Swiss-Prot record:
GO molecular function, one term: serine-type endopeptidase activity
Root EC class: hydrolase
Quaternary structure annotation from Swiss-Prot or TrEMBL: Homodimer.
EC assignment: 3.4.21.88
Gene: lexA
Residues carrying the site annotation Cleavage: A92, G93
Species assigned in the record: Bacillus velezensis (strain DSM 23117 / BGSC 10A6 / LMG 26770 / FZB42)
Protein's recorded name: LexA repressor
Length: 206
């Protein structure tokens, strides 16, 4: 197997597609435009590495003479996976990711998880956040933290020890947890415990 960088893989795919659709390979300038490289010397460098790896053959005397060789299998770089805890219940007085709170673990690509941060997932029940694109039975991806800025969507523990997902606003003498549904009223609290900030949504199609 030949391991390629994303840029090299993009170049190789573009060359193959151009040969397939047009019958001849692209120029160096066209390759650069397709993959976002302004410098022709940078494109030449990538082509040289592809040639060294045995994936293409070039004729230096001709501007478009690039032949793709298919003898080797190209290995597409794979994302690392992070197993994120899915919280089944939120219990007051114990950490959100305590073992007794966790239903299962869900694998997410590492690019969806901020480096060095603690992240958990929570299933949404109800329609209080539909105008924010968060629907019943969705799973929110939450970065664990105990503070938030006004307007951020948070997981908060109310005075009744119930977890809720709402938009956070700190007013003069109280906290307003604002739903994103015009048919629902905000929750007004004197004290609230923030468990985390919502950074993503995962949805399955039924």
């Amino acid at each position: 197997m030949t391991k390629l960088s994303k840029r090299q893989l993009d170049i190789l795919r573009f060359i193959k597609e151009e040969v397939k659709t047009k019958g001849y390979p692209p120029s160096v300038r066209e390759i650069g435009e397709a993959v976002g490289l302004a410098s022709s010397s940078t494109v030449h460098g990538h082509l040289a590495r592809l040639e060294t790896k045995g994936l293409i053959r070039r004729d230096p005397t001709k501007p478009r003479a690039i032949e793709v060789l298919d003898e080797e299998e190209v290995q597409i770089p794979k994302s690392q996976v992070v197993n994120v805890p899915v919280i089944g219940k939120v219990t007051a007085g114990i950490p959100i990711t305590a073992v007794e709170n966790i239903d299962e673990y869900f694998p997410l690509p590492d690019r969806m998880v901020p480096p060095g941060e603690h992240v958990f997932m929570l299933e949404i029940m109800g329609e209080s956040m539909i105008d924010a694109g968060i629907f019943d039975k969705d799973y929110v991806i939450v970065k664990q933290q105990n503070t938030a800025n006004n307007g951020e969507i948070v997981v908060a523990m109310t005075e009744d020890d119930e977890a809720t997902v709402k938009r956070f606003y700190k007013e003069d003498n109280y906290v307003r947890l604002q739903p994103e549904n015009p048919t629902m009223e905000p929750i007004i609290l004197q004290n609230v415990s923030i468990l985390g900030k919502v950074i993503g949504v995962f949805r399955t199609v039924h």
